[in-house]
Amino acid sequence: MAIEFIRCKNYYNEINSILENLEKKYLLPEVVKEANFIHGEKLNAILKEVSRDMHENVKYYRDMQLDYREYIETWVHEIKTPIASTKLIIENNQNEVTNKIDSQMNRIEGFVEQVLYYSRSSNVNKDYMIKSINLDNVVRNVIKRNYRDFIHKRIKIDIQDIDEIVYSDGKWIEFIINQIIGNSIKYSNNKEQMIRIYTIKKTNSVLLAIEDNGVGIVPKDINRVFEKGFTGENGRRFSKSTGMGLYLCEKLCSKLGMKIIIESEVNKGTRVTLIFPLSGMATIEPCL
């Protein structure tokens, strides 16, 4: 009886010790030793059954997530066809009405793109391809995508020397820059609007700054702009916003080993800076 008690005490002490040092508690059944007394053997069997059931449930929900993502990607692919057809019709029948329709089609296209990147963002490691990219090429692609809005809102673009090579994924970076420039367009004001784009070369990083002279962001909102679904005062005042653009930018930057910072002053403008590390993780340094 005394021997059984000692075995039981040692067994539970070992379990408590493992739990205290185990970061992922659910792995307990995988690391606990086999018991050498009756009650311990029963507990071992229960733990193994619980572990097996947990793994089956995790696999079930992982498969569901994969199915959902594949459905979203198929849906995005299919919906791009009517969007492209509509834009072609608009291109061949330009007038005041079709120009307004084109503007709304661009919004729809942007929302569709957000859906695609959101579905991929949870598993971005399997989607991106790191290679050398020229920032000038990526930025000019984004400018071309938005040229109608620049003309319509009479926004001037000042692209300084941004002919820098960085290592990242071109499609992700283009999406991020498009979200930032899209915000500059959306929150422009009635005065002479300007978007200035430039780079700063640091010892261990390249900084790409996108600066506008729009309405700016109120101080109470500036620390929340990267929150999922946060629209803030500007989102309520100017247009219906999803609150997903900057959230996705920050999430993707983090997964790509980059940094994104935002500075703003009401009625003076906003500057968003992307920090591309040249080696390892970049350190945030003042832009000025």
Model regions: which residues?
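Short conserved segments within the C-terminal catalytic ATPase subdomain
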Residues: 147-159
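Short helix-loop "hinge" at the ATP-lid/N-box region of the Bergerat-fold HATPase_c
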Residues: 184-185
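Short beta-strand/loop element within the Bergerat-fold HATPase_c
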Residues: 194-204
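Acidic ATP/Mg2+-coordinating residue in the GHKL
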Residues: 212
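Short conserved segment of the HATPase_c
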Residues: 217-230
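Glycine-rich GHKL/ HATPase_c ATP-binding element in histidine kinases
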Residues: 268-270
